[in-house]
Amino acid sequence: MILRALVVVGLLTQAPAQMTRLPQFDNDRAVSWKSVIPAHTESTLLRHDRYRTIVAIVGGDLTLVGADGKKTVVHYETGKAYWQAPMPAGEMHKDANETGKTIELVVIEMK
């Protein structure tokens, strides 16, 4: 009985899941990272100044939340690659996973 109580308390006190960025490579031409975006998490405001390719390892619907609060849902299909241009000057957004599943993306950003 005590063991069960300790397990329950341990589960309740675990830190919430957070987005992680795992470096893949960095050279003169490009930098790459793997983004692991757990369910119901949100990044801080960010921007993309360079061209990039995004490969969906585990796809899903990622919500981009503009600094003005406007939401845009981007669907990433598992196994597909996507080309994205730099963001317009001054524009920023948050990445939000409002779904119940973790999304995993590899980003390759040109230098």
Predicted regions and their residues:
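A short glycine-rich, His/Asp/Glu-containing loop-to-beta-strand
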Residues: 19-44, 49-55, 107-108
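Short acidic-glycine-tyrosine-enriched beta hairpin
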Residues: 26, 70-87
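Glycine- and acidic-residue-biased ligand/ion/polar-headgroup-sensing regions
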Residues: 48-68
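Histidine-centered metal-chelating micro-motifs
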Residues: 40-44, 80-95
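Short histidine-centered beta-strand/loop micro-motifs
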Residues: 35, 43-48, 65-66, 73-75, ...
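Sec/Tat signal peptide C-region and signal peptidase I cleavage site
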Residues: 14-17
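Sec-dependent signal peptide recognition
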Residues: 1-8
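Ligand-binding loop in jelly-roll beta-barrel domains
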Residues: 59, 88-110
